[in-house]
Amino acid sequence: MLYRSALRASRSFTPRLASTNSRLVSSLVFLEHKAGKLNEASLSAVTAAKTLGNDTHGLLVGTKSEIENVLDRTKEIKDLSKIYLATSDTYSHSLAEPLASLLASIASAKDVSHIFAAHTAVGKNIFPRLAGLLDTSLIADIIALESSGDTFTRPIYAGNAVLTIKSSPKDSVKVVTVRSTAFDKAAVANGSAAVEDVDIITVDTPTQFVSEELTVSSRPDLASAARVVSGGRALKSKESFDTILDPLADSLGAAVGASRAAVDAGYADNSLQVGQTGKVVAPELYVAIGISGAIQHLAGMKESKMIIAINKDPDAPIFQVADVGLVADLFESVPQLVKEIDNVKV
């Protein structure tokens, strides 16, 4: 594996933070939520933050009704000692500019040493801006960190190498996104976090919310599902993708995923893509159907606890990481597998 350390050069500009005589003693976790539910990936970010041994605080933002829907459960998170609330319509759609300014303000006012978020679409949108406002490095997609708080590990080259990063002492606030599959979820039980309101920060921004289209599915969320069934280009068409994968996913209670080749061919929506440029998953069970196993796809699923691969090519790279491999025609074997599963369930 490749290891490399990097120290940033000193800067001529110092961000407006708490007094240099103040002791930076707490970590802050940005807690995502949507439609009245806390994003499970944020619980992994809490676990990462707790590694440092500091007081760990959470931040909930949104309208009054949005916060009320998730506050009770959030207070139950065992590893949080305090929850900051920023209640305003300004934060109702998670626009990056106002949220980055809010986080920067809290970092200055609350003696924060580290700010964490899950490495999700929301985190990846907000945290680069936050790092810019604080004139600090963004440390993205970490899979480990040391209790010292200045050394982090992240994958590079599609997961084929690991980079060790030592942040500069000039970065008095560390801005970090966390790969959720690399950390256990913080327990949501017996917590007793205190609640504190924070000031709303108003910023002028050219970005305005226009609309949002959400895909409604009865299946588990792909990023956090315990079981995932993914299909590749070998399914040959969108119709086959749906008719072959959906029954198996329904039988297993699984989420549906897709390789980049299947997405590019129009078989599946981009939101289902698993891989280096898609979602990174680590379910208990991952079933790869008609997926050859390109390195970009493996980067998004190789940490799965159990991998089952079905492919008619015995030399397909996917078999090198699979725990169970079946060399067979997917159009025959998958329907038969569904029948067997349903028979067992009966």
From Swiss-Prot:
Record: residues binding FAD: 285-313
Q: Which cell locations does it reside in?
A: Mitochondrion matrix
Q: Cite the PROSITE patterns for this sequence.
A: ETF_ALPHA (PS00696)
Q: How is the cofactor bound?
A: Binds 1 FAD per dimer.
Cofactor names: FAD
Q: Name one GO cellular component term.
A: mitochondrial matrix
Family matches, as CDD domains: ETF_alpha
Q: Which GO terms describe its molecular function?
A: electron transfer activity; flavin adenine dinucleotide binding
Q: What are the UniProt keywords, alphabetically?
A: Electron transport, FAD, Flavoprotein, Mitochondrion, Transit peptide, Transport
Task: Identify the main location.
Answer: mitochondrion
Annotated GO biological processes are:
fatty acid beta-oxidation using acyl-CoA dehydrogenase
Family that this chain belongs to: Belongs to the ETF alpha-subunit/FixB family.
Q: What does this protein do?
A: The electron transfer flavoprotein serves as a specific electron acceptor for several dehydrogenases, including five acyl-CoA dehydrogenases, glutaryl-CoA and sarcosine dehydrogenase. It transfers the electrons to the main mitochondrial respiratory chain via ETF-ubiquinone oxidoreductase (ETF dehydrogenase).
Tell me the subunit arrangement: Heterodimer of an alpha and a beta subunit.
- Its protein name is Probable electron transfer flavoprotein subunit alpha, mitochondrial
Taxonomy, top ranks, is: Eukaryota, Fungi, Dikarya, Basidiomycota, Agaricomycotina
Q: Which gene encodes it?
A: ETF1
